[in-house]
């Protein structure tokens, strides 16, 4: 091109140089006139080819008189006035009028500035802009809308994001949020899940133990009643924590407007439970009993309760099996004739003791029943619904409204879903388990009295 022959004029116009774009000069015989690049012609702006700055170095190493350098405005300042001055003669309604603005916006937002050598910048001996783009193989004109951020820019962005992320993670707000998780329902759910697993493991170990086979008084001495007691006490402690939180929540709701809030889909409302079992709720207790029970927690509580019933039934069956196979021994108590002939100074300590095995089994049964009764007390189960009391299976003809009016939400939930609906029909496994435990308790007590001649 003719502009390349003259070293005093740059090979790229000021507009293309400011955007680091390839400048293609139009043919001189075109109607647009000489020395105009195709980009400026398309944008309908003035195309200016600025003079080069003369090199300070000479081939012979001699200093030449310096020529005054023309003061060039920065490219960032010259390009906007050129574009703005052309608005007066542009037809803003035509689609082609907005092409330069799209090119400018795309180049400013997506084009990455290329590195410039400060030693050769502004030096006439350095390669020209046209030669630089030609060396890169950019022989065709670029479409600015197809440009995308380079990997270097993305790496810098990701590096800056990674730098900001650690301080956010190190802030103590996350620890403050996670600290109360130990007192939230998920923590109770974890405890109940672990407890159910331990109960099932204990039941399986007792079923596979030698105590289930031929009864032996010596083996019975090593019976692990401590594990059963520990499971009952752990269950009672967990229930105490859960019921305490529900009571606090109920008190907090009753202190509000006095109306029961609408529970979520996974919550069981007290009024819904009572309406499902056709019991009229006391209107004076509507605000205080409006607490809701978390469904997973309630199901785990019921699972622990039924699993504990199975475990107790298994333990009492082992005790009954050993007692029934004990040999018949004469009564250790003296007859009335022997007592009459005895001297006047007979003392309590001189009386013979009963069978040691029967005494220990009786003590173990009493301790286990006390622990299980503590669990039912936390539930608030009345005597009519107790699994270890005499009136457990006598369900027909009972007034449930009289019992439920003085019980807790846990009681009503269990009565409807476990005790009442199943005990009356007597067609489910849960009912059979509760009946079996109650029957085991009564038969075991009768057998102990028989063996001890009580």
Swiss-Prot record:
Q: Which gene encodes it?
A: TF22
Question: What lineage does the source organism belong to?
Answer: Eukaryota, Fungi, Dikarya, Ascomycota, Pezizomycotina
The main location is nucleus
Q: Which GO terms describe its molecular function?
A: DNA binding; DNA-binding transcription factor activity, RNA polymerase II-specific; zinc ion binding
UniProt-annotated location(s): Nucleus
Which SMART domains does this chain map to?
GAL4 (SM00066)
Compositional bias ranges of the Basic and acidic residues kind: 63-74
Species name: Gibberella fujikuroi (strain CBS 195.34 / IMI 58289 / NRRL A-6831)
| Function of the molecule | Transcription factor that regulates the expression of the gene cluster that mediates the biosynthesis of trichosetin, a trans-fused decalin-containing tetramic acid with antimicrobial activity. Directly activates expression of only the three biosynthetic genes PKS-NRPS1, DA and ER, while TF23 and MFS-T are induced by the final product trichosetin and not by TF22.
Query: Would you tell me the Gene Ontology cellular component terms?
Result: nucleus
DNA-binding residue intervals = 13-47
By what name is this protein known? Trichosetin biosynthesis cluster transcription factor TF22
What keywords tag this UniProt record? Activator, DNA-binding, Metal-binding, Nucleus, Transcription, Transcription regulation, Zinc
